[in-house]
Amino acid sequence: RTLLNIIKKIKGIILENLLKNAKEAALKLANLDNKTKNEALEAIAKNIEKNKDVIFEKNNLDLTEAKELVKSGKITQSTYNRLKLDENKMRDMIAGIYDVIKLDDPVNKILEKTKLDDNLILEKVSCPIGVICVIFEARPDVIVQIATLAIKSGNAVVLKGGSESINTNKIFEKLINEALNSVKFPKNVINLVFTHDDVNK
């Protein structure tokens, strides 16, 4: 019991540091221009394209375990199908990143403008949220989609995927962060947690 309490305390400290680092990353990310964010997104697309074989290898590990879960009734066949990555899904995923690159910067847009008095104008301007938490199941390609949109909109993100796709989730997080590091992007923008306890905290 004492050992379990120590482990829980250590995990709590690790999670606390992760969230603190994500908040700091969000502040840096909020001030980046569109060109810098697009360069990061392009680096992600290229790194995923370059490492497709590794992604499929990790995905196959998840699929092998998921087959047993389908047999035992712990997950459905439709969940298994969503978990599976193929060339078409990969191509669409990468194309989706380039589609986001083409979008205008959603940050610092004037949404409303009201003249209150002479030389006094009130503006409603779009800004990043900060740190976003997203929970998803089965579809590991969601990591790439959410990470892409988070970066474009100037937000850091904490992701919790389903345990059935843990190997695929981990490789996507690794490749995304590798790409971000290669262009000197702020660290700790994309973060992955693994348990419901982490999310509850």
PLM region spans:
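Rossmann-like NAD(P) dinucleotide-binding subdomain of oxidoreductase/dehydrogenase enzymes
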Residues: 102, 110-201
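Extreme N-terminal basic, low-complexity initiation segments
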Residues: 2-6
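N-terminal Rossmann-like NAD(P)+-binding subdomain of aldehyde/semialdehyde dehydrogenases
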Residues: 7-121
